[in-house]
Amino acid sequence: MRLNALQHSRASDKLIYTLHYLALSHGRSVGPQRIEITLDLTHQDFANLTGLTRETAATELNKLKHQDVITYSKHTLYQLDLAKLTAMLNDQYISDIQIKL
């Protein structure tokens, strides 16, 4: 599988797509439209996954936190509002994602 979104998108697009993927593949439901990622991930881990710097990954995660899309603590427990995250995926924020199998 090739993810063109991670090659050409903005930093926010890369992070949103990665969070959505992690929520679906490694998440567990903790409430209505709330998913907890069951991996122990740091800002550096997100940077490595997306090809961003640690600082950029942290900045983008904080933006999503202020938009109430994601909550997390310094103990790296990530909970996502799946409805908001999916809306961002379907919105104009991520217009150039292509997945080729």
Residue map of PLM features:
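Amphipathic, well-packed alpha-helical segments that form the structural scaffold of globular domains
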Residues: 16-24
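Phosphate-/nucleic-acid-contacting segments
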Residues: 25-101
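A small-molecule sensor/coupling module
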Residues: 1-16, 97-101
